[in-house]
């Protein structure tokens, strides 16, 4: 990989096949799970806790409880998930938050997608508040996730996404200390 700390996480919901997951694990990928069943499957094929990310929305208590039992990284989709996670399980030392910058996502003059219409992720104001609340609850390590366009094949997508996320990361550090 271009960065020794980089890990690709495969979206298990795209192809929830244990044989494929086993191959991906052997090749060094992680598993991005969005449900209880996907967490169970990823654990069963041998992914370690650090190799599993749990990203879901409208999350049932049982899903958060299993994610905590497996000690995987939880990626919160909504600011209200903070209190719900604390109520049904506990807040881990490491938490990731999904960011939605809103508006249109464009590369050059082409609009790639409209994240502002998406129901997923936290707004700019919400992610700042989420980091403050999570810090107050003892979180020590933070991640940030964004998904701004589907089926993107241009080479410009990831550098532009990284630019957006790094800009927000700097602001989060300045405003929250996280």
Question: Model-found features: residue ranges?
Answer:
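An N-cap/entry alpha-helix motif that binds or orients negatively charged groups
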Residues: 1-4
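Active-site-proximal beta-alpha core segment in soluble small-molecule metabolic enzymes
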Residues: 7-178
């Amino acid at each position: 990989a271009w960065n020794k700390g980089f890990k690709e996480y495969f979206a298990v919901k795209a192809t929830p096949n244990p044989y494929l997951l086993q191959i991906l694990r052997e090749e060094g990928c992680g598993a991005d799970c969005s449900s209880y069943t996907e967490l169970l499957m990823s654990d069963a094929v041998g992914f370690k806790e650090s190799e599993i990310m749990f990203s879901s929305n409208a999350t049932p208590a049982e899903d958060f409880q299993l994610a905590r039992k497996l000690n995987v990284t939880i990626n919160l989709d909504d600011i209200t998930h903070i209190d719900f996670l604390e109520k049904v399980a506990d807040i881990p030392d490491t938490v990731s938050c999904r960011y939605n910058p809103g508006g249109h996502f464009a590369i050059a003059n082409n609009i790639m997608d409209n994240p502002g219409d998406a129901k997923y992720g936290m707004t700019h104001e919400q992610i700042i508040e989420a980091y403050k609340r999570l810090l107050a609850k003892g979180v020590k390590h933070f991640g940030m996730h964004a998904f701004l366009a589907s089926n993107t094949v241009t080479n410009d997508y990831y550098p532009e996404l990284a630019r957006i996320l790094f800009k927000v990361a700097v602001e989060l550090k300045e405003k929250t200390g996280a």
